[in-house]
Amino acid sequence: MASDPLSLLKTLTGKTVLVRTQDGFEVEGKLASVDEYMNLSLSDSERTLEDGSKFKLGTLHLKGENLIFISLLSS
């Protein structure tokens, strides 16, 4: 089992996650990479809008200091 948050996050590489940023932006995608600052790269990412429609974003890079949470969506 991972002993620290960064190690745990790295075990999620290749899995589908939901990410929320400080400005309320929520996106789901496959975790492609994570670095020591918890900056993330997501592939096949998409955002679900308030009306339920999905908006494809493709590859997305998120800065670690702007993240509120990361949740596993698939195992």
Model-derived features: positions:
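Conserved RNA-binding domains used in RNP assembly and mRNA/RNA metabolism
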Residues: 1-75
